[in-house]
Amino acid sequence: MEATIMKKILAVALTLALTLTAFAACAESKETLTMATNASFPPYEYVEGDQVVGIDPEIAAAVCEKMGYDLEIVDTEFDSLISGVASGKYDFVMAGMTVTEERKQMVSFSNTYATGVQVIIVKDDSPITSVDDLLADGANYTVGTQNATTGYIYAMSDIEDAGKGTVAAFPNGNEAVMALVNGKIDCVIIDNEPAKAYVAANEGLKILDSTYVVEDYAACFAKDNTELVEKFNAALEELTADGTIPAIIEKYIPAE
């Protein structure tokens, strides 16, 4: 009788131990969210060693931690980001992505977390001294941009479609800047922060004082993924209020 009771006690104890182990394993394992980006846009995203680093990866990591997810980052071509997240290939995109009405037709955006400024890079001796020179009647410059970016979209509308020059699209900002250095194009339209990095790395270039356009950056998601957008926005709001996100941006873009 005592042996039977002891066996039952041991069986119950073993079952309880296995159950607790299972619960612990569930508690330790987190669902992973995949963020797609194009890591040629410093300081928002760039490659350092074998890691994708920058403002967007750090904000994404903080937001995912707040939501209770692990984060995986995929570096891919910029012009495949919208279609990739829209099809469900990625959970979300952060890539210095500007909110536009056209993109809103394809994806959902989070709340804005940063503001970008489009500027113009030229050679030191360039005849282009302002945005007005580039957009003047009779102007006939070749303008470099990164393909599928808002810089490309604006330049096509303002310059090529208006008969004021030609727009050359490149896979990334670095290739556009190298084309400028090598005399193949007359200027590059790109966001201000990566522009600073490219000018610092290439002697003989400068950024024009006049701003081309100001725009908002946000993360984007598949149109029907409203639950994740809401969670992301809630975490974003908390991390902005407690100073985490401003500190990340300040780390890479110190206030002047």
Question: Residues of each region from the PLM?
Answer:
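Short, low-complexity disordered leader/linker segments with a strong preference
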Residues: 1-33, 256
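Extracytoplasmic small-molecule ligand-binding "clamshell" domains
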Residues: 30-96
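Periplasmic-binding protein-like
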Residues: 39, 115-124, 192, 196-236, ...
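Short helix-initiation/N-cap motifs at beta->coil->alpha
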Residues: 57, 72-85, 129, 167-182, ...
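Alpha-to-beta junction loops
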Residues: 69-70, 86-95, 139-142, 172, ...
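Ligand-binding clefts/hinges and TM-proximal coupling segments of bilobed small-molecule sensing domains
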Residues: 70-72, 150-168, 200-209, 234-256
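A ligand-binding cleft/hinge motif common to bilobed small-molecule-binding domains
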Residues: 79-80, 97-105, 153-157, 179-182, ...
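Flexible hinge/capping segments at coil-to-helix
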Residues: 122-142
